[in-house]
Amino acid sequence: MQKEPMSQFGYDKLAAELKDLKDNQRPAVVIEIDTARSHGDLKENAEYHAAREKQALIESRIAELSDLLARAQVIDPSSYEHDSVKFGSSVVIMDLDTEKESKYTLVGICEGNLDKGYISIASPIAKAMLGKKEGDDFKVRLPKGESEFEILSINYEPLKF
């Protein structure tokens, strides 16, 4: 079973979503199904079929979240050195073709937020950076083609969700 690294915030966010699905959304959709069923012929009852589809989506998400939380590995990135790129590292990189600098922080798969520079540890660029040190170059295949980057700095900055 592959562990999924995430911060305590990410774990709590997923756990809250799972609790809401189980405690609120699942019972509500059961009521919707019962109400729609009381309207008669199920073959031509669009309300009933929509509620059943909604129920399937909720059950699917519950299964997905349950699996993810079972595999969660909560990591406190402040507890270790950031001498190489790891989960929780803030990394400044430079595109060697354009000399454009970008800063990214590696976070769990459910915590990505590109506006804040938070990228999933499962993203192609994060995977290519893992284990690298300052001054190292790495290549990554992006939608626009292969690009080469240099790691300018690595440090830890507390996450601000």
From Swiss-Prot:
Q: Report the record's disulfide bonds.
A: none
Query: Carries keyword Coiled coil?
Result: yes
Gene3D superfamilies the UniProt entry points to: Transcription elongation factor, GreA/GreB, C-terminal domain, Transcription elongation factor, GreA/GreB, N-terminal domain
What this chain does, per the entry, is described as:
Necessary for efficient RNA polymerase transcription elongation past template-encoded arresting sites. The arresting sites in DNA have the property of trapping a certain fraction of elongating RNA polymerases that pass through, resulting in locked ternary complexes. Cleavage of the nascent transcript by cleavage factors such as GreA or GreB allows the resumption of elongation from the new 3'terminus. GreA releases sequences of 2 to 3 nucleotides.
InterPro entries tied to this protein: GreA/GreB_C_sf, TF_GreA/GreB_CS, Tscrpt_elong_fac_GreA, Tscrpt_elong_fac_GreA/B, Tscrpt_elong_fac_GreA/B_C, Tscrpt_elong_fac_GreA/B_fam, Tscrpt_elong_fac_GreA/B_N, Tscrpt_elong_fac_GreA/B_N_sf
Annotated GO biological process: DNA-templated transcription elongation; regulation of DNA-templated transcription elongation
Family of this protein: Belongs to the GreA/GreB family.
UniProt key word Coiled coil: yes
Coiled-coil segments: 45-73
**PANTHER family under this entry?**
TRANSCRIPTION ELONGATION FACTOR GREA
Q: Which keywords belong to this entry? A: Coiled coil, DNA-binding, Transcription, Transcription regulation
Return the protein name.
Transcription elongation factor GreA
Q: Which organism is it from?
A: Campylobacter jejuni subsp. jejuni serotype O:2 (strain ATCC 700819 / NCTC 11168)
Q: A single Gene Ontology molecular function, please?
A: RNA polymerase binding
